[in-house]
Amino acid sequence: MDDVLSKRKIMYKYETHCHTSPVSFCAKASVAETVQFYKSLGYAGLFITNHFLDGNICPSVKTLPYNDQLDFYFSDYEAGVREGEKIGISVFPGIELSYKGTDFLIYGLDKSWFQEHPEIMEMKKTEELQLMMDSGALVIQAHPYREEYYINHIRLFPRHVHGVEVINTSQKEEANEMAALYENTIISWRPVDRTITGQAMYSRNSAAKG
């Protein structure tokens, strides 16, 4: 029986960190192009984690009222769901929060949650992360050791995340190695409920980078 089961094992691939245009200002690929791209690679699904309202979102949107910004923000995800249903790939919502070049991937909160919590735009980042965790979100620090010209120093938040992203192919290998060390030594030993280690699989050919 075990032999039969082992032969039937199936590996499912999910992209957990990607950006789409026009919501994320850094992205070049449209939602449809992105969803079709991951479908062509054999992925079972993807999380659309565009930069949130506090980050690298389309600049003209930031002058709109909060709920209008949310409508624009979630429009890519909603279009992604429709495209996924057409071609047979699951599309899930996520967001990427930003704080002075430090980014966090948030999973498990839908549009209605953000509509009910406009106060997050005025909260300290640690308070915002804690509120999201208390609301059931999974919080992952993205590329914690990324080095860019606009990042003046590395910031770590071990008490306000469930895990860290340890694979990001847009980063140097040394940055991923340090993230894995941090995850396996500091984060994994904290006395909190941890269910997964943050990971993201980027295609080097993808135009949607984080």
Where are these regions (language model features)?
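Active-site-proximal loop/helix segments of hydrolase catalytic cores
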Residues: 28, 121, 140-156, 171
